Structures are given as C-alpha cells and as structure tokens.
C-alpha cells in the first residue's frame, strides 16, 4: 500500500492494481457522506477524540452542484472498496484553508495520510490561499505527531462547547431584534467578519445569505432601534439534530451593553424553534470574555481543538 501513486484519471488515483485507490472530488455526495461518517465513527470510538470535518455542511452545499472537477476538496483513500483514509479542505473566506482528516485505526502508520496530504498540498499550491490550518484534537496522539512532523507552527486553540439541558434561559431580548439576513446584507456580513476574525475584506469572499440558507446556514443581523449592531450565523443539521452557533459578534461601538448575551440567547431560541436537540459552539481559548459569557449561559467545554499553520 506504500507504492508510488499511479496515473490520474476521472478523479481517481490508483495506488495498486487491485486493492487501493484514491478518489478526488470537489463535493461529496450522499454515498461519500455515509463512507466518511462510518470512518469517523471508527476513529472516534477508538481514539475518544473529536474531529471537525463539516461533512453535514458540505453535503448540503453540494446539492445541485455540477460534477465537474474544478477544484479538489475531498480526498478519499479506499482499500477493497472500504474508505480507510480521508482529508477534507474547507474554505470559509480569506486567504486560509482549513484541513482535517483521519485514518482507520487498523491502517495507520502505512503512509495513507501522507499520500493524501501530498495531494492536498498539490491542490493548495494551485490556489490563491496563502495559509493552511491543520486541525487536531488536543488529545489526538497521531494527529499531533503528524502535524509536528511537517513543521507546522501553533496558531490557536478552540473549545467546543455544548449547552447543558439543565440550564434555563431567563433573559429576555429587551433591546435586540434578530433579523434574517438577505442578499442585500452580504456586504455588511463580510465587513463584520473582517472585524471579528481579523481577515481582509475581499470582494471574492462575500457570502450570499440566501444561497447559504439552502445549505442550512442562516445568518441573522442583530438590530437595536433599526441599527445593525452585530450578527450571528446558525447551522441547522437535519442528520443529527445538532444546532451550531458561529460568527457571533458585536460591532465595537456597541460593546459593553449586554448585546452579546442577548444575541446568544436569541440564537439559542432560534435553534430550539428549529427542533435542535443539542446546541454547540466554538470559541478561542484566549477569548476569555466570550468564554465567560458562554459559560454563564449554560455552555460547557466538551473538547479542545488545536490549530496549526503552514504558509507558502
């Protein structure tokens, strides 16, 4: 299984004549989703760690997309038609790609991940993105070892947090109104992202809210007296009934007034209205103010994800 890669045709790289091949795709379909989900279960059960693969989001975005291979985001290593290795690329705007992956416990230390990662780097070289973030659970020995072996530098750490069922929200939205964003708000959303995440405000990174809503990602603008003071993005997964809260922020001129808490409570209520059984979010460990806010609203830390960076 460690022989050099063979020829590339129709999005498939043959690793050996009989047993192994690598499938390359721009988007996953439902069969891919099932294969990746099955591999993820094997890895999580064995390692007792977490992964950030975003496959529910990817599947929902792929609906209606053409089958043309314009860029490669999905790298799948099969052995006897069983998926044993996977790396996925995510791009959420800016000049940075996010990469996460896994190898079946029974097929580790055989060069599977290295082969996939070489292909990922080849794809990265073709793109304008200057940086690549590699994600690993803080407790993943194999993940941390691989990242160290390629010389990536530590970037930051995030907690994944889930809302406890015991916590009761007793704060009313007295000031903040959450309005679902439409396409006219696209520039405003990109502008706010550039503030909160310290990324350049580029025209090509503009997200179209009504298109994202088709993929289960809904952005709400927070308004006070008809003025936009912040935003939040909610992800609704139909496959596992987990609702996600992302990109929550308050503009600098409106901070210190309790609006962040009101936006958070409003986001929780929106997800409950959509029948989310569990609600999660992610926060940088260095962001003590946000961390304390989330804890005070009933969120508890469930895992730690480390981010490492390599650059061109």
PLM feature segments, named:
Residues 53-57, 172-243:
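Flexible, substrate/cofactor-facing loop regions flanked by secondary structure
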Residues 109-122, 149, 247-250, 256-273, ...:
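Conserved acetyl-CoA-binding loop-helix of GNAT-fold acetyltransferases
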Residues 4-17, 93, 105-174, 305-310:
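Acyl-donor-binding surface of acyltransferase catalytic domains
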Residues 19-38, 176-189:
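A short beta-loop-alpha structural element at the N-terminal edge
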Residues 44, 48, 52-120, 124, ...:
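Conserved donor-binding loop and adjoining core beta-sheet/short helix segment
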Residues 99, 132-135, 245, 279-283:
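Conserved hydrophobic beta-strand within the GNAT/NAT acetyltransferase core sheet
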Residues 100, 104, 108, 137, ...:
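Residue-level recognition of the GNAT/N-acetyltransferase active site
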């Amino acid at each position: 299984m460690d022989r050099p890669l063979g020829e590339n045709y129709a999005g498939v790289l043959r690793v050996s004549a009989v047993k192994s091949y690598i499938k390359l795709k721009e988007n996953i379909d439902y069969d891919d989703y099932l294969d990746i989900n099955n591999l993820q279960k094997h890895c999580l059960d064995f390692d007792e760690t977490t992964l950030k693969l975003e496959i529910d989001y990817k599947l929902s975005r792929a609906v209606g997309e053409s089958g043309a291979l314009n860029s490669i985001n999905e790298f799948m290593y099969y052995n006897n038609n069983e998926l044993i290795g996977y790396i996925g690329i995510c791009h959420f705007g800016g000049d940075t790609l996010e990469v996460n992956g896994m190898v079946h416990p029974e097929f580790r230390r055989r060069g599977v991940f290295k082969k996939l990662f070489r292909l990922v780097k080849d794809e990265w070289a073709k793109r304008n993105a200057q940086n690549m973030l590699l994600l690993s659970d803080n407790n993943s020995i194999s993940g941390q070892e691989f990242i160290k072996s390629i010389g990536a530098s530590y970037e930051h750490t995030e907690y994944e947090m889930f809302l406890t069922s015991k916590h009761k929200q007793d704060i009313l939205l007295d000031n903040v109104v959450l309005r679902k964003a439409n396409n006219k708000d696209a520039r405003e959303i990109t502008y706010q992202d550039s503030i909160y995440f310290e990324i350049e405000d580029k025209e090509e990174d503009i997200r179209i809210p009504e298109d994202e809503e088709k993929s289960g990602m809904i952005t709400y603008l927070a308004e006070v007296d008809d003025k936009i003071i912040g935003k939040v993005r909610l992800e609704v997964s139909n496959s596992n009934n987990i609702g996600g809260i992302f990109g929550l922020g308050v503009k600098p001129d409106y901070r210190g007034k309790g609006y962040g808490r009101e936006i958070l409570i409003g986001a929780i209520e929106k997800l409950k209205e959509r029948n989310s059984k569990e609600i999660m979010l992610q926060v940088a460990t260095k962001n003590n103010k946000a961390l304390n806010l989330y804890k005070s609203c009933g969120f508890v830390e469930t895992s730690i994800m480390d981010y490492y960076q390599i650059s061109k």
